[in-house]
């Protein structure tokens, strides 16, 4: 029935949260974006195609798992330079990167040496990319209604309006 809404169970919704502050997210954003790019884009593609977040729970869990794994790797390999970097961002005015370039360089060097991750160039993550996915295409990806029948053809001569146009100020 179209009136019944099926909600996911609590077990389906249960995931371990990524409990970090905005400064930590901002400090890790460039490397996180590079490492979890495919899972994030696949999740956003699912959300755009399905228009229903309940159908994208599996992809959402993969995004969450990627984020948790990313922060665990940072914590185990580069905890000290990362803490200096996000603390600098947290205490700087409006979390601006320009105040913390020295800490950023130390963190980027640590990540490069120990994990082999190169900081992506500016604009690299915002480029348009194609996402290869194993999900089937939705039946109606644009959620559009069926097209209505065209108006019937009017037979006979059409006469001009009796009192002119509706836009009276145009005809004066």
UniProtKB/Swiss-Prot annotation:
- Which GO biological process categories is it annotated with? aerobic respiration; mitochondrial electron transport, NADH to ubiquinone; proton motive force-driven mitochondrial ATP synthesis
Q: Where does motif Cx9C motif 2 map?
A: 56-66
Task: Please list the disulfide bridges.
Answer: 36-66, 46-56, 78-110, 88-100
| This protein's UniProt keywords | Disulfide bond, Electron transport, Membrane, Mitochondrion, Mitochondrion inner membrane, Repeat, Respiratory chain, Transport
Question: Motif Cx9C motif 3 residues?
Answer: 78-88
Q: Where in this protein would one find the motif Cx9C motif 4, according to its record?
A: 100-110
Q: What is its main location?
A: mitochondrion
Record motif Cx9C motif 1, residues: 36-46
Self-association state and partner proteins as the record states: Complex I is composed of 45 different subunits.
The job of this chain, per UniProt, is described as: Accessory subunit of the mitochondrial membrane respiratory chain NADH dehydrogenase (Complex I), that is believed not to be involved in catalysis. Complex I functions in the transfer of electrons from NADH to the respiratory chain. The immediate electron acceptor for the enzyme is believed to be ubiquinone.
* Protein name, entry field: NADH dehydrogenase [ubiquinone] 1 alpha subcomplex subunit 8
UniProt source species: Mus musculus (Mouse)
Upper classification of the source organism reads: Eukaryota, Metazoa, Chordata, Craniata, Vertebrata
What is the gene name?
A: Ndufa8
């Amino acid at each position: 029935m179209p009136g019944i809404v099926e909600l996911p169970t609590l077990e389906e919704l249960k995931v371990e949260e990524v409990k970090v502050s905005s400064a930590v997210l901002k400090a890790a954003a460039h490397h996180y974006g590079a490492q979890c790019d495919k899972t994030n884009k696949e999740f956003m593609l699912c959300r755009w195609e399905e228009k229903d977040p309940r159908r994208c729970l599996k992809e959402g869990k993969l995004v969450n798992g990627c984020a948790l794994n990313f922060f665990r790797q940072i914590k185990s390999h580069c905890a000290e330079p990362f803490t200096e970097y996000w603390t600098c961002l947290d205490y700087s005015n409006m979390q601006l990167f320009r105040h913390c370039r020295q800490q950023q360089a130390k963190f980027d060097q640590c990540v490069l040496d120990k994990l082999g991750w190169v900081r992506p160039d500016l604009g690299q993550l915002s480029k348009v990319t194609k996402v290869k996915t194993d999900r089937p295409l939705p039946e109606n990806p644009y959620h559009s209604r069926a097209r209505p029948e065209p108006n019937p053809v009017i037979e006979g001569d059409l006469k001009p309006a009796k009192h002119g146009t509706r836009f009276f100020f145009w005809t004066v």
